[in-house]
Amino acid sequence: MKNVKFYICPHCGNIVEMVNDAGVKPFCCGQKMQELVPGSVDASHEKHVPDVKVSEGAVEVNVGSVNHPMEEVHWIEWVQLVTDKGSYRKWLNPGEAPNVKFLFGEEKPIAVYAYCNLHGLWKNEIN
């Protein structure tokens, strides 16, 4: 799969994933959206970087080597698995555990992204 890019609107907070990058940044609320760069916010890596376990046809993700808080004001909104054939996203809610399991066919997992509502986008590349 091509390089995955996410953008956020600095005005309203909308987030989009670039499906086909033709070189033009997306617009929202009358202005250019800002690219979300994984790990660019000064925050605890041990609570944000996805901890990934790969097994035959499955990827288990725990957000953080130390569980990320899942409170009404601070939580992981979603986790996304990127493979060589596409991607899978799961949404989380406050109060839930910050872990998910993805089941897939004969695809090769490439990376996992996690989005914190306060500290932005985080990524772990799978070797």
Question: What feature does the model see in each segment?
Answer:
Residues 9-12, 28, 116:
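Short cysteine-rich clusters marking metal-coordination/redox-active sites
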Residues 6, 25, 113:
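Residues immediately within or flanking Cys/His clusters that coordinate Zn2+
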Residues 63-71:
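Short amphipathic, basic-aromatic surface patches that mediate peripheral association
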Residues 62-63, 98-105:
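Exposed aromatic-hydrophobic patches
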Residues 22-33:
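Cysteine-rich micro-motifs
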Residues 108-118:
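Short, aromatic- and glycine-rich surface loops/edge beta-strands on solvent-exposed regions
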Residues 117-125:
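Short acidic/polar inter-strand loop motif in beta-rich domains
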Residues 18-22, 36-39, 124-126:
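Short Cys/His-rich "knuckle" micro-motifs
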